């Protein structure tokens, strides 16, 4: 008797995507401040119901194809669905813009967001099954964005309300990007300068680890908004006592308290990553290095540091992603960044303006995480070789 094995993950994603097709694909509103009316795919293009049925049948068939061939088919179909969703959203916005007023806005609906997320999850699951090599996985993930980026730069998506917000605020967006990157690297670099030596010191001075980690744990538990607020008064008093600090850009609000707070939040993962990375090295390895005649400095530079590097990079990845997200809150004290767009959108009830600030933050976090994943995986491959 022949048994068919089905890919349960792909089948579940297919079911959820079918449910997403029943939700509004886009939302159409007469202006940016009014709640939009949901439009389904079959309302926009009645003939698309047959395309959806065809794609669903092909996707279902891929669930039963065994091995790598099935995964490749699943990747192609899921990527096709994602590209089709992006292209369809742009075409729907253009179609509605031709029939509506210049103030009308076409936003992405819940059906689009859910279906796109599920298609990307299906792509990720298929890539995981296709290859185990980190570089190939990374390249397969990156190629998913090629066609959507081409659609973006070709102008296909220009009539979406999100793109209209970008066109109206391009200078503000560029400034926000520069400020957000300044917050990111301006916090991570000093944190590295402080955290790495502090972690090494804690490793060699185990008696002091408890006090250091207790202090850093307390800092980590303070809510970000509270810590930003606590730094305003001392910094303002410092600038009042020493006015020349103001010429250096130091103030009670703005970048200075934001950078100090972000550095403080970054210290615990970095210090702990250094200590854990050095502690996980087997003692047999250190004894072998000592037996070879290596000095303490040589053992640290040529044995301990390379072996601890993957663990440290994982901690640095956490810090980078954490800082990308927390920099959004820094806009509350005038530090700028994408958080300024988010809070402006919330205050004016403009969801598309909120998305204009949120989406780049998500993209930065995902890219940062992907780059560190690739680097860590390549280090493991090199070590195994």
UniProtKB/Swiss-Prot annotation:
Q: How does it assemble?
A: The complex is composed of two ATP-binding proteins (YehX), two transmembrane proteins (YehW and YehY) and a solute-binding protein (YehZ).
Q: Which gene encodes it?
A: yehY
Its organism's taxonomic lineage begins at: Bacteria, Pseudomonadati, Pseudomonadota, Gammaproteobacteria, Enterobacterales
The UniProt similarity line reads: Belongs to the binding-protein-dependent transport system permease family. CysTW subfamily.
Membrane topology of the entry:
Multi-pass membrane protein
Record field: transmembrane: 6-26, 45-65, 70-90, 107-127, 138-158, 181-201, 225-245, 248-268, 323-343, 346-366
Q: Which organism is it from?
A: Escherichia coli (strain K12)
Q: What keyword terms does UniProt attach to this protein? A: Amino-acid transport, Cell inner membrane, Cell membrane, Membrane, Transmembrane, Transmembrane helix, Transport
Spans within the Cytoplasmic topological domain: 1-5, 66-69, 128-137, 202-224, 269-322, 367-385
Q: What is this protein called?
A: Glycine betaine uptake system permease protein YehY
Induction (UniProt): Expression is sigma S-dependent. Induced by both osmotic shock and entry into stationary phase.
Q: List GO BP terms, alphabetically.
A: amino acid transport; amino-acid betaine transport; glycine betaine transport; transmembrane transport
